[in-house]
UniProtKB/Swiss-Prot annotation:
GO terms for molecular function: argininosuccinate lyase activity. The gene is argH. The keyword Lyase applies. It is an enzyme of class 4 (lyase). Its EC number is 4.3.2.1. Belongs to the lyase 1 family. Argininosuccinate lyase subfamily. One of its GO terms (biological process) is L-arginine biosynthetic process. Pathway: Amino-acid biosynthesis; L-arginine biosynthesis; L-arginine from L-ornithine and carbamoyl phosphate: step 3/3. SUPFAM superfamilies: L-aspartase-like. Coiled coil: none annotated. It catalyses: 2-(N(omega)-L-arginino)succinate = fumarate + L-arginine. This is Argininosuccinate lyase. One of its GO terms (cellular component) is cytosol.
Length: 476
């Protein structure tokens, strides 16, 4: 059964059809429930398009002025909620064209369609939207990195057990560990900025796929919409969505990085670890167990990482088999990336609050730092500095661990006689590295956990935060 639209419905196609689409097709095709968020960008594109129509001699001065007034009114009505999509509007473009025609009349309103297609419109609008959101997400990431830096600075002298395979490995400073989570987030920001260079191309002027024959200037539209250039190939401009997929990848990578932090926070907040206490404002309780204090933000972040990965996987699956140029499958590119944006924008502020307000149990971390024979590597490397070959030094350090296990003691508990019995190379001077502080101080190369290097690293991280702030304030 054909769908009967009301008399106000605008359809951007249909002249060669004897009737309207079926109700089932109309419902399947409709996208205003998710693409309406692009309305502001669509209107900005229409303004720029009107100006190039005027520059090409296709609108006179009065027509351009009337068009711009109509678009200004439409934008105000969209912002206030006075104008919204109707059930018969197919997408954001048709809804806004209907609103535009209602404000300037069908004759002038119909002129705006000349020289553009929904194909080049949507390819441009999505770039505009994502470039703006990339800056918003960058600002939120910088807030989180700053919270990690603040916690690192507040705990600069706190040792903790560094781990590999979740087993005690070597002592490190808590500040060093926290910044190990901050740097991947900085790289996520760098990915967003690098992505922005590729997203900085307008597809306006590509038409449906072959470009325009009306003498329009794509570079003028690009400049007005905040792009540095227009696409060099009209087919690529309308059909490519790698820019969307790449954004979804960065969002998924951010999710993975947050999930790794979350896993540690969840462990550290357990009774067995007791490394941290989460603030009441960023924890929840149990409906049945009164004593519970649950790390919900960390758990939700861990779960939402899977959602972000799913957004990326779904998008790539949609894109993998599409011939050039535009295909309607590409309507499915927006919901995954919109979901990724929404997920990060609600998750990051909560995550930052959790990190900023957690309390560190310094004594507990310091107590566990030397346990699990975590100073064994220091013995081996001390021996290397005494010119003992590392293969032999490794064996000697391992023998120290074996003796300690047999006697139920830890490495610092070995007497001078014990050490000499294990190897004549183990003189009393080895004790300079048989303390957590000695171990930390010895890791003095760039990137190491020595206190001096960690202070330098913190300054470097603070500078990176400041350097990236400018991107969040730049015009997309």
């Amino acid at each position: 059964m054909a769908h009967e639209p009301d008399s106000q419905t605008v359809r951007l196609w249909g002249g060669r059809f004897s009737g309207g689409p079926s109700e089932a097709l109309a419902r399947l095709s409709q996208s205003t429930h998710f693409d309406w968020r692009l309305a502001r960008y669509d209107i900005a594109g229409s303004r720029a398009h009107a100006r190039v129509l005027h520059a090409a001699g296709l609108l006179d001065d009065a027509e351009l002025a009337q068009m711009l007034r109509g678009l200004d009114q439409l934008e105000a009505d969209v912002a206030s909620g006075a104008f919204t999509p109707s059930p018969d509007d197919e997408d954001v473009h048709t809804a806004l064209e209907r609103g535009f025609i209602e404000r300037v009349g069908p004759e002038l309103g119909g002129r705006l369609r000349a020289g553009r297609s929904r194909n080049d419109q949507i390819a441009t609008l999505v770039r505009m939207y994502l470039r703006e959101e990339a800056r918003a997400i960058t600002a939120l990431l910088l807030d989180l990195v700053a919270a990690l830096a603040d916690q690192a600075e507040a705990n600069l002298d706190v040792p903790m057990p560094g781990r590999t395979h979740l087993q005690h490995a070597q002592p490190v400073l808590l500040a060093h560990h926290l910044m190990a989570h901050a740097w991947p987030l900085i790289r996520d920001i760098e990915r967003l900025r690098d992505w922005d260079r590729r997203a900085d191309m307008s597809a306006y002027g590509s038409g449906a796929l072959a470009g325009s024959s009306l003498g329009l200037d794509p570079e003028a539209v690009a400049a007005e919409l905040g792009f540095s250039r227009s696409v060099p190939n009209s087919i690529d401009g309308t059909a490519a969505r790698d820019v969307v997929a790449e954004f979804a990848f960065v969002a998924a990578m951010i999710g993975v990085d947050l999930s790794r932090i979350s896993e540690e926070i969840i462990l550290w907040a357990t009774k067995e670890f007791s490394f941290i206490t989460l603030d009441d404002a960023f924890s929840t309780g149990s409906s049945i167990m009164p004593q519970k204090k649950n790390p919900d933000i960390a758990e939700l972040a861990r779960g939402k990482a899977g959602r972000l990965i799913g957004d990326l996987a779904g998008l790539l699956s949609t894109l993998k088999g599409l011939p050039l140029a535009y295909n309607r499958d590409l309507q499915e590119d927006k919901e995954p990336v919109f979901d990724a944006v929404d997920t990060l924008k609600v998750l990051l502020p909560a995550f930052t609050g959790m990190v900023a307000t957690l309390t560190v149990n310094r004594e507990r971390m310091a107590e566990l730092a030397p346990q699990g024979f975590s100073l064994a590597t220091d013995i081996a490397e001390w021996l290397v500095r005494q010119r003992v070959p590392f293969r032999e030094a490794h064996e000697i350090a391992g023998a120290c661990v074996r003796v300690c296990e047999e006697r139920g003691i830890d490495l610092p508990d070995l007497s001078d006689a014990d050490l000499a019995a294990i190897s004549p190379h183990l003189t009393p001077q080895v004790r300079e590295v048989l303390t957590v502080q000695g171990s930390l101080e010895s890791r003095a190369a760039r990137g190491g956990t020595a206190p001096a290097r960690v202070r330098e690293q913190l300054a470097e991280l603070r500078k990176a935060i400041d350097d990236h702030r400018a991107f969040t304030q730049s015009h997309a």
